[in-house]
């Protein structure tokens, strides 16, 4: 196969490269258009974390609800329950292992966090990133030296259906999220608030 590839004329290889990797500006526009198709969804999700050597560190299952512009709730059930929830103003992060709730304003959420980028999806957000894509797979690299990640991979189809999210951390740990979207409309009476469990330690950072 490699021999055959070497025999291809240079201009064909160049054309294939251009086809496979759209320009950064084109990729950014395509990704933004697809994310704009997402208004809300409910999905089951599988999470897998691997170390820099590829060993599986953790596997879990959960659920996630997202409703633009800034409503979301996610629950991971194993190995212990973790909940992240926002009512549009307040962000709650609950860790059942330590029985601790961390509270913050949603406006203070890190601007380059993957969830923030997917929900907000505005032009200003993508100016801080280099983006390339091959078909439905988008590779996102931060221009900031102090970014919270090295690379994000988003797989989203032309209908705006989110399939996968892969986050490569600065320590070379990878977190894989596989989505199985069940609904694209969330009821208006769905509760995005979080009820703090009795006896939980509260770390209020507002």
UniProtKB/Swiss-Prot annotation:
Pfam families, per the entry: LolA (PF03548)
Gene Ontology annotations for the cellular component aspect, listed alphabetically: outer membrane-bounded periplasmic space
Signal peptide: 1-20
Subcellular location, record wording: Periplasm
Keywords: Chaperone, Periplasm, Protein transport, Signal, Transport
A Gene Ontology biological process term: lipoprotein localization to outer membrane
Subunit structure comment from the entry: Monomer.
Function per UniProt: Participates in the translocation of lipoproteins from the inner membrane to the outer membrane. Only forms a complex with a lipoprotein if the residue after the N-terminal Cys is not an aspartate (The Asp acts as a targeting signal to indicate that the lipoprotein should stay in the inner membrane).
HAMAP family associated with the record: LolA
Classification via PANTHER family: OUTER-MEMBRANE LIPOPROTEIN CARRIER PROTEIN
Family label: Belongs to the LolA family.
Protein's UniProt name: Outer-membrane lipoprotein carrier protein
Species the sequence originates in: Wigglesworthia glossinidia brevipalpis
